[in-house]
Amino acid sequence: MILIIYAHPYPHHSHANKRMLEQAGTLENVEIRSLYHLYPDFNIDVAAEQEALSRASLIVWQHPMQWYSVPPLLKLWMDKVLTHGWAYGHGGTALHGKHLLWAVTTGGGENHFTIGSHPGFDVLSQPLQATALYCGLKWLPPFAMHCTFICDDDTLQAQARQYKQRLLAWQEVNHG
């Protein structure tokens, strides 16, 4: 099962993430958990989140990039849900062997994220990749949708279909 942990503080304003979720939602065995919908008060149900994670084979952290990082509720989710003794540390093997995909949208162009004046995705992904590896997850190459503020609908739809294809390809390789 693919579990998408979706974290967008303003989901009604996101054309890109909306299209990505629409495409992903057409696949079988996909569960989407919208953190800002489930926890508008930031009071996370840790047991429910850990149960959802335990059912998943692929975990996707999908969100808009905010200040070169994750939105605040996703960071809190990581702090609360990925606990010692469950996700890492002594006895913390609940996530071992599962895959993790970082699916991120950005307002800037892809060239904005090249080493030079701004850090590249290989640098930006390091904290998430380190978290994944620390929890025994298998890190997959990120999926990034760029220029989301200026893309026309056809471009957004095409990129959302690429996202769906990425998830479908994972399903085919990992579950025949």
From Swiss-Prot:
Known partners and oligomeric status: Homodimer. Interacts with KefC.
One Pfam entry name: Flavodoxin_2
Keyword presence, Flavoprotein: yes
Cellular location(s): Cell inner membrane
Entry similarity comment: Belongs to the NAD(P)H dehydrogenase (quinone) family. KefF subfamily.
E.C. number: 1.6.5.2
Enzyme's top EC category: oxidoreductase
Key words, A-Z: Cell inner membrane, Cell membrane, Flavoprotein, FMN, Membrane, NAD, Oxidoreductase
Principal location: membrane
Swiss-Prot/TrEMBL cofactor(s): FMN
Function of the molecule: Regulatory subunit of a potassium efflux system that confers protection against electrophiles. Required for full activity of KefC. Shows redox enzymatic activity, but this enzymatic activity is not required for activation of KefC.
Membrane topology annotation: Peripheral membrane protein
Binding site for FMN: 8, 14-17, 65-68, 105-108
Record-given protein name: Glutathione-regulated potassium-efflux system ancillary protein KefF
Catalytic activity, reaction form: a quinone + NADH + H(+) = a quinol + NAD(+); a quinone + NADPH + H(+) = a quinol + NADP(+)
GO biological process assignments: positive regulation of potassium ion transmembrane transport; potassium ion transport
Molecular function in Gene Ontology: electron transfer activity; FMN binding; NADH:ubiquinone reductase (non-electrogenic) activity; NADPH dehydrogenase (quinone) activity
Record's GO cellular component terms: plasma membrane
Domain of life: Bacteria
KW Oxidoreductase (keyword) present: yes
UniProt xrefs under InterPro entries: Flavodoxin_fold (IPR003680), Flavoprotein-like_sf (IPR029039), K_H_efflux_KefF (IPR023948), KefG/KefF (IPR046980)
Gene that this polypeptide is encoded by: kefF
